[in-house]
């Protein structure tokens, strides 16, 4: 028998959050743009988890669970002193590993006075965070060094869309619609024919070749011109 809640959504598009958290956590996720995280802590909601991002005294990025274990106040509402982030409620101090190192009202810290910490790496123009098992980190974030290469022009920002984020993810992953819906924009027909796939152990693999195609006028006129960075 299927769970009654699950049964209700069979054959329907499942609203975000209705069946719980099923994000792949043991992988790198973009947490923020590098230039967003400066001297003040910044709050993020990542994978249904409150996270606070900040920088240590030497500029190294850090990430903690954004709740003080005492009264669950958001640490992102506090401030940073040296390498410590200070809770805005009772002034408890936490290091980048999530351990409480000082509480103004008591001399000894209980072992339970700690919160989860997350590995953060700065690569390209982004901060990447590992939200899963911190002992299972077995790879580096994707190589996006071109984002800070002087031979490239990189633009960053946010674009708010009033829609379920799942729809955007599905659209980006679905490349088969490009030749039909965007035929006057991208002029790319490589995805009309399904590529051959093969099994390598437990991994399904395929190879796809793309022909060079000229950009449409709308993309040419809306793309930024190269800048002389010399």
Residue ranges and their predicted role:
Residues 217:
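Flavin (primarily FAD) cofactor-binding/catalytic cores of flavoenzymes
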């Amino acid at each position: 028998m299927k769970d009654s809640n699950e049964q209700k959504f069979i054959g329907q598009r499942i609203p975000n959050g209705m069946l719980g958290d099923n994000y792949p956590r043991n992988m790198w996720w973009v947490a923020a743009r590098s230039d967003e995280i400066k001297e003040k802590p910044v709050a993020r909601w990542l994978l249904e988890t409150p996270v606070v991002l900040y920088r240590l005294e030497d500029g190294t990025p850090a990430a903690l669970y954004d709740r003080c274990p005492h009264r669950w106040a958001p640490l992102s509402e506090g401030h940073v002193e040296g390498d410590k982030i200070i809770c805005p409620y009772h002034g408890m101090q936490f290091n980048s590993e999530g351990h409480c190192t000082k509480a103004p009202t008591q001399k000894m810290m209980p072992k339970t006075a700690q919160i989860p910490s997350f590995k953060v790496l700065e690569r390209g123009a982004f901060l990447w965070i590992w939200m899963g098992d911190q002992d299972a980190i077995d790879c580096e974030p994707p190589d996006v060094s071109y984002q800070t290469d002087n031979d490239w022009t990189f633009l960053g920002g946010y674009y708010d869309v009033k829609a379920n984020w799942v729809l955007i993810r599905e659209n980006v992953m679905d490349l088969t619609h490009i030749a039909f819906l965007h035929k006057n924009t991208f002029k790319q027909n490589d995805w009309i024919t399904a590529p051959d796939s093969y099994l390598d152990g437990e991994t399904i693999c395929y190879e796809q070749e793309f022909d060079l195609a000229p950009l449409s006028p709308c993309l040419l006129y809306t793309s930024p011109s190269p800048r002389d960075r010399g």
